[in-house]
Amino acid sequence: MRVGERVIVDAAVTGDGVHHSGVIEDIYDFARTSIVDVHFDEPTPWGTWGATVTNLGMIRKEEAA
């Protein structure tokens, strides 16, 4: 994963039952974990435009169409 890469964030992250596409804005690497900020293409139903993800298993690379 790298900044600027298109990804899909699992629905469990936002809790709205929808997988969200977006772009990685920042990656913070710490001793035992990485934190990834993703900006979504469209807002979640409650108006948030992104997520901070600590479980990297909840992010996958978006496949080209």
List the predicted regions and their residue ranges:
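Short coil-to-beta transition motif at edge beta-strands of beta-rich domains
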Residues: 1-14
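Short acidic/glycine-enriched loop/turn segments that link adjacent beta-strands
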Residues: 31-34
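Beta-strand secondary-structure signal
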Residues: 6-8, 21, 37
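Short beta-strand-centered aromatic/proline hotspots
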Residues: 17-28
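Intrinsically disordered, low-complexity, charged/polar segments
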Residues: 37-65
